[in-house]
Amino acid sequence: RDSVASRGLGDVYKRQAESETPVLCEAKRWLDIYFSGREPDFTPPLHPVGSAFQQAVWALLLEIPYGETTTYGTLARKLAEKQGLTHMSAQAVGGAVGHNDISLIIPCHRVVGASSSLTGYAGGVDKKIKLLELERADMKSFFVPKKGTAL
């Protein structure tokens, strides 16, 4: 009988670890640090796929410090400034934020609505709250709107 139980789980985990790529190992290490309640001091190698506009928005998300938040409007103003524009739509920025497939490492949970409303997280507002609490963000002024998702 050569069952998993008789071989021990160590063999299973060892084979799994041997098959992981360096990129996956780095991402796993980042996630382990993050979910232990500490700020990772590195960003694993990322290759998000999206339009030039989405890439620009996601780059701004990576600049939001651990435990802090910003608004869609602030991101729109920063992006407009970087691109030499007078105005950028917060809704357009919100759309790009919403298409972020690496939503934990590229921290879209740190973006809130204009009036400190907790809106627009693909994993659900309850998860957004938990992630911000894990980062020890100051949650006093935030609220979950009863209707709408004003950016």
Regions found by a protein language model. Give the residues of each.
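Single conserved hydrophobic/aromatic residue that forms the stacking wall/gate
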Residues: 2-13
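Long, low-complexity, charged/polar intrinsically disordered regions in eukaryotic proteins
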Residues: 22-37
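N-terminal positively charged helical leader segments and presequences
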Residues: 16-17
